[in-house]
């Protein structure tokens, strides 16, 4: 066997080994946590027996946090859809430099720590006691944090050349702006809307830093309850809470992978770029074929 093939096998084997070690490093703690939530005694392991009593205890104590997290996530999604989709369309259609500045400002909450965003909200709206003690205060923070994901996902689709051409064609046929937006823009922007919606739901349910600063004893969400369970109760209870958390978030993550969703909209942008390149190639071929098709007519005219 040639020397370079041996070296290649060694390198591939080394990369595979490193990859498996990294996967084990990340997966083993999750598996151990799940097992701790299903065993009678974590320190004795599976030999102590399997049980669902910890899950039952967690559900009895924290089901209010579960439903509150779902309500906050759905409210956040509704607001980000109402604001993000029109904003993404406007940013994609605008050619002003201010639109680019606005887009960068929308992404700013992602770059800032969640604690900084929470402190800003507390300093401005913390004096409104009714608002401060309601779930809508947390919803406001989640909207600020998740809105960029909705805007970028939808804007990547709206910036596509084919969508612009369809809009121009509908406008030339007399369609109003509302008709174009409802019958052309929204149906074609569906992949970006679905991507943004899944990202918003996942991020809202799992957000901890921002929620920790904004919550009150009456507005304890799922991640806050998870931290409380690990800090003040048995390890088995906290691990059972982890199982409950995974049962809520894993379906969303699987849906994102199954649908090929990229929260930042990169995949949608790549698809739009591919369509644009295909359209440009088609136009180039048509222009190249035009002189060939007109040559016989020109020669006949000369005769």
What are these model-predicted stretches?
Residues 4-5, 43-44, 48, 52, ...:
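Membrane-interfacial helix termini and adjacent extracytoplasmic/periplasmic loops
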Residues 3-11, 41-42, 55-61, 205-262, ...:
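Interhelical loop and adjacent transmembrane-helix boundary motif
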Residues 63, 67, 71-83, 87, ...:
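Hydrophobic alpha-helical transmembrane segments of multipass integral membrane proteins
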Residues 2-8, 74-106, 119, 123-127, ...:
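Transmembrane-helix boundary motif in ABC transporter permease subunits
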Residues 15-16, 64-68, 126-150, 191-192, ...:
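Loop-to-helix entry region at the N-terminal start of transmembrane alpha-helices
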